[in-house]
Amino acid sequence: PDGTLNKHKARLCAHGRMQQWGVSYWETYSPVVNMLTVRLLLALCNIHGLESKSIDFVLAFPQADLDVDIWMELPLGIEVAESPEQSRAYVLKLRKSLYGLKQASLNWFEKLKQGLVDRGFTPSEIDPCLYLKDDMVLLKYVDDCIIISPSIENIDRLIKSMQRGRENFRLTDEGDVNKFLGIEITKLDNHSFELSQPFLIDRILSFLGLCNNNFETDANSSLTPVAKGLLHQDLAGKSRKYSWNYRTAVGMLSYLQNSTRPEISMATHQTARFSNSPMLSHEKSIMRIGRYLLDTRKRGIIYKPDVSKGLECYVDADFAGGWSQADSENADNVLSRTGYIIMYADCPILWVSRLQTEIALSTAEAEYITLSQSLRDVIPLITLLKEINTVFPVHVKMPTFVCKVHEDNQSCITMATTTKFSPRTKHIALKYHHFCCYVK
């Protein structure tokens, strides 16, 4: 995760831009594991004291077979022995999926999936990158995998089976899981662990010019990631003055907040709204987030599982919080903000802060929309827990297969728990009532 060079790689890449749909490729999409699943499995691994290992597949894409006929010119430096001067007149038929092909990631996904299914694994219905078997689970993100089981011998046996099987997977055993997708996983005392990304934060600070290559800085830090008030379009404001790419900064901050820093979610989302035409005020907001990260670069989320607590969801909404009289004609300013966090055994596994897509007409309606959106994540999560429970127990002292939702708006609670008809709420779309049959 610190960006240190481990090894040099030489890759032959295809020109995927020259491919034609229906001729040299069909489907291209391949899923990756949800971060919710990663955090949930790490919490369960800690609760039950399970063993875990990470593996990395070497040159993953070329290990997969192609599903269509693709021909390629000879790469520069390769000649035909019989007639070297005519080498450019020859072509090669590809047998494996090269980097650069549009379907390369999908071919690799199917290759690994078939190899795991042949070894008795079953893919999850909720997360297709989670595989379950007996007392073992495996989750994958392209070519990086985490294997969890009560027995380290079973994990080693699976790794050897994949290396020596008919697929002849080329992989490296990375040992204990101490990093995954650039996230540091640090085991602490008292059965707790921490998720952090200090090296990504260093990269962000260097990108924004807040520190040098030695991470020395004379910039002032900020106590909070966002200033008082909300960002607006600011078309009459001053133009940008910084040279760094605005969208790149937003992308790095978005990955950081989605992985280990939920407290910057709202601030990051505000800046992301104006990626198309940022002004100086929007740049200053990003710089404020950077200054906040200066003093908190080594901080992350500390997970201390509490087995007395099960699945819980905390919900809140900010009704038309962006409205201002100075910019009252902008419809986006009256959108309410959704915010919720889902906890399992007192460990945060999912958090969201975003604007609602419809204009709510009251606080109760804004809260109800937020409640509905949060339960779109909760309901499949319950199914995911049931799937994992077939491999190893996920029960804590309170029932795990129900979710306690914390909502403080009484009108919203009434709408969610009763079928009482009200002329003031009949306009609420059917899609927000989807969870009512689950309420108890």
Region roles according to the model:
Residues 119-126, 146-201, 205-208, 213, ...:
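Polymerase palm active-site segment centered on the conserved acidic dipeptide of motif C
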Residues 58-59, 128-133, 176-181, 271-273:
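Short amphipathic alpha-helical segments embedded in low-complexity Lys/Glu-rich regions
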Residues 87-93, 177-180, 265-268:
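A short alpha-helix capping/helix-loop junction motif
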Residues 1-139, 144-164:
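Metal/cofactor- and membrane transport-associated sequence elements
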Residues 12, 29, 38, 137, ...:
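Divalent metal-binding acidic/histidine catalytic loops
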